[in-house]
Amino acid sequence: MIGYLALARETFDVEFAESKFSNAKSLLLSLSPSAIGFNELITNDEDASKALTFFKSNPCDKIFLFQTTFTDAKFLLNFAQEINKPICIVSFPEPRTGGRLRLNSICGLNLGMHSLIKNSITPEFVIMESD
């Protein structure tokens, strides 16, 4: 069974992050209709605890984690250590506009990968080019 969840930080464009999560989730479900997931953006410790409980109650063979915005790696590292299943982090590029990034998702991917690898966890990653 494949599982999915999404991380976000509320200081970024949460509405845009939701749309990225929705589109990516739709693609995943079209490829793996039996995939299950935590369908709320994880933006705080309470959401993180609920997501961890969900996946402990619904074991999966692999997890797709949608890094919809930049976040620190605290939840990702804790989740990976607790669940102990292969993780693929999916990130979303955005065009350079000269202004502030709306998501900064790839930076979150970089930080998450660094944290996991530093702790002897070897994730996979995908940069989802378009919706």
Identify the residue ranges that each predicted region occupies.
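An N-terminal assembly and electron-transfer interface module characteristic of large anaerobic redox
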Residues: 1-131
